[in-house]
Amino acid sequence: MKDLKKIESYLDKLRIKEKDGEERKIYAEVLDGRTLKTLYKLSAKGYITAMGGVISTGKEANVFYADGVFDGKPVAMAVKIYRIETSEFDKMDEYLYGDERFDMRRISPKEKVFIWTEKEFRNLERAKEAGVSVPQPYTYMKNVLLMEFIGEDELPAPTLVELGRELKELDVEGIFNDVVENVKRLYQEAELVHADLSEYNIMYIDKVYFIDMGQAVTLRHPMAESYLERDVRNIIRFFSKYGVKADFEEMLKEVKGE
């Protein structure tokens, strides 16, 4: 009962755009009191001006739309909230423990989630600085990450898999080349490997955007080469369905600049 009262208290403090109570109900169902407190702190700091609807929900994270402010300008935000209570993060250990940027000694499950949130922010920041097409990261706090919303009118841009047959109406070869160029830039300039790249986490709206950057690793990670090969195979496999022909060895060399 006490936790429920806390949730109601923070929901009262947060501005939620929809007036019919449906969004409020969803917030109460998927977010715990600690996370709502973090959202309120980000709101009090001036980052979030109004929370909007649910973009996606999952075992690891929920993503919401929000109106916000960054560098003194109004922006459309995606608010990614990692679940503190989740067993899914055991699967993420290989991406964390091989990353020299983080000290993983004596880490509790909750702290692991916080480190993962920081890791995604830092990966986005590093990729953006290198010219990779990713959402602009704004800030993070505990298990909450604020970044650029990719879409229009509060509707997220589709992923390549969501485009489905519509992809045939577009310049598939051009989109493929855009993906390859961004993988290349991510590797050569940002010195990162996405490590989970597929049609499920590449958005498209006039150009491609790589998302879900939490698992991305540096080139010094012991599995970086293996992850890169998997990413390249995934890209070739998907685009082959639309008539794009690419050689694995040649593409791998192009990405690595060999």
UniProtKB/Swiss-Prot annotation:
Taxonomic lineage of the native organism: Archaea, Methanobacteriati, Methanobacteriota, Archaeoglobi, Archaeoglobales
Residues that, per the record, bind ATP: 55-63, 80, 148, 150, 200-201, 212
InterPro entries cross-referenced by the UniProt entry: Kinase-like_dom_sf (IPR011009), Prot_kinase_dom (IPR000719), RIO-type_Ser/Thr_kinase (IPR051272), RIO_dom (IPR018934), RIO_kinase (IPR000687), RIO_kinase_CS (IPR018935)
A molecular function (GO) term: protein serine kinase activity
Native organism: Archaeoglobus fulgidus (strain ATCC 49558 / DSM 4304 / JCM 9628 / NBRC 100126 / VC-16)
Superkingdom, natural source: Archaea
Functional summary from the UniProt entry: Autophosphorylation of the rio1 protein is not necessary for maintenance of kinase activity. Prefers ATP over GTP. The yeast ortholog is involved in ribosome biogenesis. Despite the protein kinase domain is proposed to act predominantly as an ATPase.
Name of this protein: RIO-type serine/threonine-protein kinase Rio1
EC class of the enzyme, as a word: transferase
